[in-house]
Amino acid sequence: MAEVEIKQENVVHSRPRLITDEEMHYCPGCSHGTVHNLIAEVIDEMGLEEDTIAISPVGCAVFAYRYIDVDWIEAAHGRACAVASAVKRLHPKKLVFSYQGDGDLTAIGAGETIHAAARGENIVTIFINNAIYGMTGGQMSPTTLLGMKTATTPYGRDAALNGFPYKIADMMAHLDGATYITRQSVHTPANVRKCKRAIRKAFENSLAGNGYSLVEVVATCNSGWKLSPVEANKWMEENMLPHYPLGDIKCSKLPK
């Protein structure tokens, strides 16, 4: 059958140009793929393909460099913001962002992340928060909810034993060097559009030299949560979003 040529004015949606042909390794229903698409679309629309340097983490997104066709550096576990800070200082006109999960960012990388924000580094962090260690078997992370069952909290997270989950975005909003802090999701079409706008705003904030930006994406991990993709979205709405409410947390200018 001959291919039907679709006129550009009739295209409703197409594969983002900067998404490679590599088959993504993510589980069906995972939020990572959607966020990858949004990042690729925003970079393309801003004309930054040749002026972007991204830092990939250790975790489920360790192979992000295979999927988005820009320059990447693979950082040691938790050190993405430290690497991004150095790269941005060496290449101040480039868009530099790190892409990290809740294990890489809020556990082993908490110090590097918080201090990058405190210094007001002109970088962006895309933070995927699914409240579990997806790559290593579904263990508890710092953002795991109270009562949430994981491989290391089979009876549910207990504050007396495991401590409380913490909201790193809210914490970082108190830092003068962090000027744009937002929390989004991609579990509905409307939320996907809002998340895309937030990513673009963060990139623009960085390029304007206005300090550190964090886009937290409250995400699902249906395999780690032992739920179907549909059930995971519902569980996230009912349990994650009350604890991690969506919206802009801080939008300001660097202090003089």
Residue ranges, per PLM feature:
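Structural motif
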Residues: 51-54, 94-97, 122-126, 170, ...
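Short, hinge-like loop/turn segments at secondary-structure boundaries
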Residues: 70-73, 116, 141-145, 231-234
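Conserved thiamine diphosphate
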Residues: 14, 93, 141-208
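Flexible, low-complexity linker and terminal segments
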Residues: 1-12, 16, 21, 207-256
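Thiamine diphosphate
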Residues: 1-134, 197-201, 208
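Glycine-rich beta-alpha junction loops
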Residues: 58-60, 130-132, 188, 217-224
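Active-site-proximal loop->helix
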Residues: 110-115, 135-149
